């Protein structure tokens, strides 16, 4: 091989684009997770789920960290485990992209949570493969959260978001919260009839970047213009002063029913969210990096306090929106 050909080959390797999000791979992960069956926190099935997630991430060349603890729920003590992988970037300041992998505990019917618990985990496994090959401006931590679902039938008080609250508290204690710049949450993104609304309890600039990205990609039929208020795993981060956004489709007839199966989901929906998240990531990295450069210090944002005004209520018709508590945010988004 001539020197010229070697140079051309080296240039091609250097500029090769990172792999794209592959919904076929994500769908296969979702299929495998759903095949495990119901996966509530503390169950043998969720242990099997953790094993599958860990095997897939390890095969992608990533090191999985377990964060385990015993949680006192209104029913009993439950072992819970968050899983995370860290993908280094040009800066150690990091973005967390998270989703829960547990399913709600039901004894009266078989609940496999294809979209609610399955889609977020499957999405993150595939996203890990893509981000590992990407040149990241910031360090990215992918976080698989346990214990998002309430143990009692209804979402209330502190019987929910166990994993995200534990993660934030541990990050506060060990000092790692100081390098956490923003958080993106994916939840219930498998809906065959995907309709993601802006969450009014999410940070406005993150919402704007995501919805602008969807519009540029001609995906605004899926990321639609109206909004609702959601209580989810992003709120413990917001309460700690971290900009956070919830990407969630609550307009889902199969939510918390035996019909939340693969038949109610679509690989296309996973692809849409993958394309938007990856398309938005450069802008998010640029905004965070610019802020760090301008301030000349490692700050994680203005502290916001979050107040629950009234409990979540469920509305069952097709165009219902599951409103988990309305919140007021004392600082501007």
Show which residues each predicted segment covers.
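Acidic/histidine-rich catalytic neighborhood of metal-dependent amide-processing enzymes
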Residues: 108-209, 226-229, 234
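A non-catalytic alpha/beta surface segment that caps or lines the substrate-entry region
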Residues: 28-90
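Sec/Tat-exported extracytoplasmic proteins
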Residues: 30, 34-41, 57-64, 87, ...
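Structural recognition of the beta-strand scaffold that forms the well-ordered cores
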Residues: 32, 66, 84, 94-98, ...
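Active-site-adjacent substrate-binding region
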Residues: 45, 68-70, 182, 189-289
């Amino acid at each position: 091989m001539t020197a010229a050909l070697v140079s051309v080959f080296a240039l091609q390797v250097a500029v090769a684009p990172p792999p794209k999000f592959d919904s076929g791979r994500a769908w296969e992960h979702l299929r495998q997770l759903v095949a495990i069956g119901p996966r509530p926190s503390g169950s043998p099935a969720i242990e099997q789920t953790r094993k599958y997630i860990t095997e897939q991430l390890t095969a992608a060349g990533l090191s999985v960290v377990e964060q385990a603890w015993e949680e006192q729920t209104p029913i009993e003590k439950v072992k819970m485990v968050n899983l995370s992988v860290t993908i280094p970037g040009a800066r150690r300041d990091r973005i967390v992209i998270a989703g829960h992998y547990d399913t709600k505990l039901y004894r009266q019917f078989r609940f496999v949570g294809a979209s609610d618990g399955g889609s977020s985990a499957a999405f993150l496994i595939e996203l890990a493969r893509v981000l590992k090959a990407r040149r990241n401006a910031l360090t990215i931590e992918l976080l698989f959260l346990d214990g998002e679902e309430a143990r009692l039938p209804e979402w209330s008080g502190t019987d929910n978001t166990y994993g995200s609250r534990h993660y934030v508290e541990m990050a506060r204690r060990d000092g790692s919260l100081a390098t956490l710049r923003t958080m993106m949450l994916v939840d219930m993104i498998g809906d065959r009839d995907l309709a993601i609304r802006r969450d009014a309890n999410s940070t406005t600039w993150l919402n704007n970047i995501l919805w602008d990205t969807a519009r540029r990609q001609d995906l605004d039929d899926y990321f639609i213009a109206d909004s609702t208020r959601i209580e989810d795993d992003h709120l413990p981060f917001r309460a700690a002063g971290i900009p956070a956004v919830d990407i969630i489709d609550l307009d889902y007839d199969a939510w918390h029913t035996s019909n939340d199966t693969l038949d109610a989901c679509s690989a296309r929906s996973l692809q849409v969210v993958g394309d938007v998240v990856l398309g938005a990531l450069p802008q998010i990295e640029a905004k965070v990096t610019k802020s760090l450069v301008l301030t000349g210090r490692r700050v994680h944002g203005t502290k916001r306090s979050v107040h629950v005004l009234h409990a979540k209520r469920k509305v069952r018709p097709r165009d219902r929106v599951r409103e988990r508590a309305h919140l007021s945010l004392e600082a501007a988004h």
